[in-house]
């Protein structure tokens, strides 16, 4: 332990942060310890399967409307405060004050609550609904407290995105500002955060310790990646993204800078690398926090299910994944072979259940009513629904979560069968367009030695194999065209006229936009999946099913 270190700031107040504080005391550190976190309860109050105790701005939802929940949070804060002796802790929590609830963070020391800051800026866009639950204290002001002679300020998450809260805190005397966050991952977020931190520190001269929640919460994945910023705007990456860790940093108050003990090298931060870490963490935490130790994947020999299998193995380990082939009269020998090849490469158990008996049973049962009709999409969907029913039966009988394999392109235009391949509890590819599925598959094959997805799977034309010689492009535009239109319409909210003006054929745009519109009902019934884009289906895009608008 450095002889010059008199105080320690631990970023994160979860199990790892608590363990870090205990270890410091165990090894004789007698200085000030600041434990800063967004968590609303101590580690021993957070059951491993309880989503209620993950303090995210979008995580608690209508639990915040329940008086009993708010009372338990208040009681937990009292227990934490009583235990805080010899350290200073900053803990986020929903503070009920009469009929109003505040998104608050309290400073705890000497067995009591020393001060409380109430969040000023409440996000009410995208995945955030804070104005539904929280109020703003009209009399609330800056929160500045002393830690070993250093005036430390406190603002919460969205407050940092507006200049006034940080400026007011600095004017109140803060030289170092702690910013607890529950900020979910999306592409480009790291660079955006770093630029914001540099801007705020340069404007105020105060250093910042920016800490973020780590882990999956249903459709959101919090990436952690906590950073510290010197008073001159220099940003230091301090924590690995998508991984929980305890972090100790040294701060030089006279210079308002953090001393470089060990700044983290987070390795590959490419678009694909971060997307992979987001979806694998999403799968891992959804399973762990909801009590699923194992998963099932219907493996077709196509790219979507192959990518889901690779994600599942990285998230949970091969021993906890079972793949199932469900061949039909239209399944090619190549599809069966590629599924077997991938399972052998990954060490995954492979089962085979033919759908032909179930399919024939449905056809026989419906035969009298279908007499005189021509086979069409109905019979194709029946095959998918046979697969969905069989996979759900395996999940029910033997336990484990069924992962769905649909991607964002399919969910957008309805090329996923309701009660068929949409069966399952979690959708790892839900926010990845088909072109991104290909890109992510190629990237993953470059990591860690031998390919985890057979190259032939990536090379072959996509097909649902629900009729003879079927290809996706028989009824859809090429995926590079389709996804470019969808990106503009879904993610960027561009109108038909704007998309056509960008050079896309009007008839193609009309077809795609109609498919998006008429398949809203399917998306309302889809399983959750990890958000990686700036505009994911679900909470961020809330469209009515019954809708006459055609723009």
Language-model region placement:
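Enzyme catalytic cores with a strong preference for nitrogen-chemistry domains
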Residues: 61-298, 309-318, 325, 350
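Short, surface-exposed alpha-helical segments at coil->helix boundaries
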Residues: 47, 60-63, 74-77, 194, ...
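Conserved G/P- and acidic residue-centered "switch" motifs that form tight phosphate/ATP-binding loops
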Residues: 14, 159, 302
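Residues at the starts of beta-strands that form the adenosine-phosphate
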Residues: 7, 30-32, 175, 320-322, ...
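Short beta-strand "acidic-cap" motif of Rossmann-like dinucleotide-binding folds
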Residues: 30-37, 116, 323-325, 352
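Beta1-alpha1 glycine-rich phosphate/pyrophosphate-binding loop at the start
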Residues: 4-63
């Amino acid at each position: 332990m450095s002889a010059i270190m008199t105080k320690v700031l631990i970023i994160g107040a979860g199990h790892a942060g608590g363990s870090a504080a205990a270890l410091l005391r165990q090894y004789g550190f007698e200085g000030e310890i600041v434990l800063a976190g967004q968590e609303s309860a101590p580690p021993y109050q957070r059951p491993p399967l309880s989503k209620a105790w993950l303090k995210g701005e979008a995580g608690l939802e209508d639990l915040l409307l329940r008086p009993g929940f708010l009372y338990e949070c208040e009681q937990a804060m009292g227990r934490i405060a009583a235990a805080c002796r010899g350290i200073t802790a900053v803990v986020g929590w929903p503070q009920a004050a009469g009929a109003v609830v505040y998104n608050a963070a309290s400073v705890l020391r000497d067995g009591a609550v020393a001060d409380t800051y109430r969040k000023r800026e409440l996000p009410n866009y995208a995945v955030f609904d804070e104005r539904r639950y929280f109020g703003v204290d009209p009399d609330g002001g800056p929160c500045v407290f002393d830690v070993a002679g250093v005036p430390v300020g406190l603002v919460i998450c969205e407050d940092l995105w507006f200049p006034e809260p940080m400026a007011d805190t600095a004017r109140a005397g803060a030289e170092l500002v702690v910013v607890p966050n529950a900020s979910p991952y999306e592409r480009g977020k790291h660079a955006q955060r770093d630029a914001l931190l540099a801007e705020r520190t340069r404007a105020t001269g105060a250093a910042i310790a920016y800490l973020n929640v780590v882990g999956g919460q249903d459709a959101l994945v919090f990436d952690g990646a906590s950073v510290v910023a010197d008073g001159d705007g220099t940003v230091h990456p301090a924590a690995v993204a998508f991984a929980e860790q305890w972090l100790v940093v040294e701060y030089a108050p006279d210079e308002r800078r953090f001393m470089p003990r060990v700044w983290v090298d987070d390795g590959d931060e490419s678009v694909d690398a971060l997307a992979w870490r987001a979806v694998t963490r999403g799968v891992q935490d959804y399973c762990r926090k909801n009590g699923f130790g194992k998963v099932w994947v219907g493996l077709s020999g196509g790219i979507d299910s192959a990518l889901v299998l690779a994600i599942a193995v990285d998230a949970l380990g091969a021993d906890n994944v079972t793949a199932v082939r469900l061949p039909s009269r239209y399944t090619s020998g190549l599809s069966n072979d590629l599924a077997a090849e991938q399972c052998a490469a990954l060490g995954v158990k492979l089962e085979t259940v033919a759908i032909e008996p179930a399919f024939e049973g449905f056809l026989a049962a419906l035969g009298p009513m279908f007499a005189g009709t021509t086979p069409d999409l109905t019979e194709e969907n029946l095959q998918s629904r046979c697969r969905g029913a069989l996979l759900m039966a395996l999940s029910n009988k033997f336990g484990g979560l069924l992962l769905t394999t649909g991607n964002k392109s399919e969910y957008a235009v309805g090329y996923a069968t309701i009660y068929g391949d949409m069966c399952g509890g979690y959708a790892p590819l839900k926010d990845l367009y088909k072109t991104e599925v290909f890109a992510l598959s190629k990237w993953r094959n470059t990591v860690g030695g031998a390919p985890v997805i057979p190259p032939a799977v990536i090379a072959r034309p996509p097909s649902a194999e629900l009729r003879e010689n079927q290809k996706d492009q028989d009824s859809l535009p090429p995926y590079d065209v389709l996804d470019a239109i969808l990106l503009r319409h879904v993610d960027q909210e561009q109108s038909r006229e704007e998309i056509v003006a960008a050079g896309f054929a009007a008839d193609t745009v009309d077809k795609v936009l109609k498919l998006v519109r008429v398949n809203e009902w399917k998306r309302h019934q889809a399983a959750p999946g990890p958000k990686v884009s700036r505009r994911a289906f679900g909470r961020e895009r809330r469209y009515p099913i019954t809708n006459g608008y055609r723009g």
